[in-house]
Every structure is written in C-alpha cells, then in structure tokens.
Amino acid sequence: MALDASSLTRKLHVFSAKYVKISEETTRRARRLVKDYIEGQIIAYITENSNIEIQKLEYTGSFYEGLKTENADEADIMVVLKTPGSGIEVVQSQVPGYVHLKARDAPMFSKYMSPKGYIKAKKLRNSWFQSYVRRAVNKIEPQPPHSEVRLVVRSHGPAVQVDIIRKGSEEMLLSVDLVPCFQVEDSWYVPKPFKGKRYLSRNELLWRKTFSPKEKQILASMDKDPNGQGGCRHELLRIVKTVVKKPVTSLPLDSYHLKAAFMHYNDRGDLDWVSEDALGKNFFGFLMELQIRMESRNLPNYWLDGINLLDDFKEDVVKQMANRLRRILNSEVRLNKILE
C-alpha cells in the first residue's frame, strides 16, 4: 500500500486528541492522591512502625513514563527496602531472569528467611508488606479535596494494589501498585511469582530482576532531543497502545510487549522523528515492525538475552496477530478503520 504520511499524520493527531490524551485535571488528581494517601499516609505509617526500613520510592510504569492513555487512573511505585550493612548477595537461579537473595546479619528480615538465609519473596510481600499496608489503610484519615474516598487493598502479581474509590458512585479514582523491592548496586529485584511450566521445589525463594527504573529513564526522556528538536515518540506509542485495544484491531499485546518492541524499533538509527509527517511514517513503520516480530514469532526481551516475550502466547494466537497486522498494513480502508 502506498503511504500518504501527511494524511495519516493528520488522522493520527485527531485520533490522539479524541481517544488517547489524558486531561490535566485527572493527572493532577492522580498526583495529589499519591501524595495525600500513598506517600503521606501508607508509606509514612510503614516508615514509622516497621523495623524494616524504606530507603526510597521509584516511580515507574506508564503514568510516570508519560505513556498513560485515556485516563490517569493507574500508578506504579517501587518501594525500595533498605538493606543491612553487610548487604544482599545475589545468587543466580536456574530460571532466566530470576535470582535468590541472601542476607547476612539481617535480623529485620529473619522472619522472612529460609534456614540458609535466603529471603522468601512471597512471605515478605504478604506477611510483612501487605500486612503493613492493610494496617495503614485501616488508619487512613480523609484528605481534602478528595476526602470522600475509601481504600481497598488486594494482591496483584508482585504488587500490593491499593484502589482509591469515590464513595457513593464507586468510581475508581486511582489504582496504585506498590511493589516491595531490593536494589543491589544498579539492579532491582521484585517478588514476582514464577509462572513457568517447569516444576520448582523452592520457587518461593525466587526474585524477579526488573528493569522498570532503567526503562523509565529511556521512555520518559526519549523525546528530549539534545538539539532541542523533540519528537513524536511518546504520542506514537500512546496511540499504538490505544489502537491495539480497539475491538476492530484486537491484539492481545499489553504495555509490556509494546514497550519492548518499541525500544527495539527506536534503537534504529535511521528514523525521522521531527518532520511534519514523522508521526504517520513511524506509525506505519512501527506496525510493520510488530508484524515482522509476529511473523517470525520473535520479540526478544530488551534487557535479557535468550528470552522471547512471544513465548507468553500460544502459536496460533501469534499467527493470528501477524495476519491481522498484515491485513491492516495492506489496506488503506482497514488502516483508516482502526483510527475511527
């Protein structure tokens, strides 16, 4: 299909304004809720009452990367725990991307350690972190201008999820994933459960290496050109994240897969991000990149060698995605349809 990049760019700007961009009001509200309830009360309560100390907070995920779409209703915060003076030893496991964490002279973690000194991921998250979050929520004091809310706590993967809900209407104002983690030198580890097919006798000791802070460094600043030219990367990725969820497109790719594919695409040195029709050219180019990845059934983890993110999907699902993308790329009618 011959590409009219200028026309496509105009349509993409209209689509972005209509379906993608989030309002300043909801963004300000999300930041205020994090400040008043998460930082000001939950984190403050844990800091004041637990013998396990919090070193710092890392603000990660789409909201803080400038990639959130439609509504500012989710936030991700990594709660970095202070390690003992003797430090934490990282011991490689047999599972790619997962490690064991061994602590010495660390009485604050003794309840959550194996006899050999390995920190139990699930036990630390549930018995300590989630327990303290629940206690903090039970003592929450309403904070204007958002005082008519209630907080609900639940488990969510490696996180303790705190939902801030408007009383009466039951409207979800903000859902915050709080993830306890350890930072060892320039690496971060979170208690993400292992869900692989092989049986592991001690999977409660596994900690997942996460690259969220490094990912944020790349994604949050990717349009800050040193020459001051900027670019359209943020807008492009927000648009694609929105497009893939539309029923007419229906690609079961989540933000995690799209960010990885985009970082690979962005590493190419021959891309134009600043011309008037750059958005249209790169929208088409990135969809082609996704189609090629699906066709070859190969989307490498951006950070870890030997991990194919498409292994998350059944083979026929990947084939369907490849075919769907090919039909969109080969038909102007279908391409326009996904932007309606």
From Swiss-Prot:
Binding site for Mn(2+): 267, 270
Gene3D superfamilies in alphabetical order: 3.30.460.90
Database matches in InterPro entries: Mab-21-like_nuc_Trfase, Mab-21_HhH/H2TH-like, MAB21L/cGLR
Keyword RNA-binding: no
The keyword Magnesium is annotated on this UniProt entry: yes
GO molecular function, a single term: double-stranded DNA binding
GO BP, sorted A to Z: innate immune response
Residues the entry annotates as binding ATP: 62, 74-76, 241, 255-259
Protein keywords: ATP-binding, GTP-binding, Immunity, Innate immunity, Magnesium, Manganese, Metal-binding, Nucleotide-binding, Nucleotidyltransferase, Transferase
Domain of life: Eukaryota
Binding annotation for Mg(2+): 74, 76, 177
Catalytic function, reaction form: 2 ATP = 3',3'-c-di-AMP + 2 diphosphate
Pfam family, one: Mab-21_C
Necessary cofactors: Mg(2+); Mn(2+)
Listed EC numbers: 2.7.7.85
Cited function: Nucleotidyltransferase that catalyzes the formation of cyclic di-AMP (3',3'-c-di-AMP) from 2 molecules of ATP and plays a key role in innate immunity. Acts as a key sensor of double-stranded RNA (dsRNA), the presence of dsRNA in the cytoplasm being a danger signal that triggers the immune responses. Directly binds dsRNA, activating the nucleotidyltransferase activity, leading to synthesis of 3',3'-c-di-AMP, a second messenger that binds to and activates Sting, thereby triggering the immune response via activation of the NF-kappa-B transcription factor.
Family the UniProt entry places it in: Belongs to the mab-21 family.
Designated name of the protein: Cyclic GMP-AMP synthase-like receptor 3
The species this protein was found in: Stylophora pistillata
Highest classification ranks of the organism: Eukaryota, Metazoa, Cnidaria, Anthozoa, Hexacorallia
